[in-house]
Amino acid sequence: MSHTAEIPLVPGSESPLELKPLKAADPHVVYHRRAHRLLSLAKDSPLADYFELCRRLVSIQAKLAEEADFGQLLAWGKDEATPLSLLGSEADSYWQGLLQQLLSDLLPQVDESIARVVRLLMQQSPEQLSSWGRSLRQGHVSEVPAHFSLFIWAAMGVYWSHWAPMVIKRMDQRKVAQQSMCPVCGCHPVASVIVDQPRAGLRYLHCSLCESEWHYIRAHCTSCGQDKEMTIWSLDDAQAQVRIESCDECHGYTKMMFVEMSPSMDVVADDLATLMLDSELNAKGFGATTLNPLLMAHEIT
């Protein structure tokens, strides 16, 4: 159960063909679909055990997204570029409460090695958790113990994704500029998704925290913005469902998920399932400018 601050909605066009700068997610639906996709992908993956852990975690996220008490929307920067990035320390108690619920639900579902990590995380102080949460949201992954990051981000994701749709309704989307970071919460994208609605071939970046999507013109680097020296890579053919767009100027890259070709795809799960593409690009001297909430393995600046 949750309550929304009394902030007037910003009117928008009703044209079905209008390009939407921002698209809100239904977190319960997103998490449910992600869990199903992880189950499907695990069948042919050498990382089947890890996929199963992630599936259980995401299934708990789906449950919390539907059943948890999120309190009321805290003060947020409605006139700022990334309003949910400005939530104060009051938000910490809410997402930390979700973290304890998530860990309690997960504990009986994991083996003893994971259970030890879960119990240790449950014993951390609120101040320590707040510090780690800030570091993760700022992309400073190395400042947080690697064995805790997955669970902390999962809890924060449930909280931020709950409020993002309501905040988006109250944002003036006419002021949303093309940008590398999420216009709602300020976090990194997971990857690009190529969609066929409202028009075929549109690209959106998918947020790693609040699950929102924002439009970004294709053939432009999603990190530095240049549009002249871009290269497309794929493992099999030019029409692959997952491809990588790399930038010859900043040497960053982002994956592109062609969900128009395969509607069952999930940006987080399918990014995790195509790590061989990352290995190929890393070997060529390129680095990801994105963050996967299920594999927080590198520093992002």
Swiss-Prot record:
SUPFAM superfamilies registered for this protein in UniProt: FdhE-like
Keywords assigned by UniProt, alphabetized: Cytoplasm
GO biological process: protein maturation
Domain of life per record: Bacteria
InterPro entries referenced in this protein's UniProt entry, alphabetically: FdhE-like_sf (IPR024064), FdhE_C (IPR056796), FdhE_central (IPR056797), FdhE_N (IPR056774), Formate_DH_accessory (IPR006452)
Cellular localization per UniProt: Cytoplasm
Main location: cytoplasm
Annotated GO MF terms: ferric iron binding
Record family assignment: Belongs to the FdhE family.
Reported function: Necessary for formate dehydrogenase activity.
Cross-referenced NCBIfam families: FdhE
Name of the protein in its database record: Protein FdhE homolog
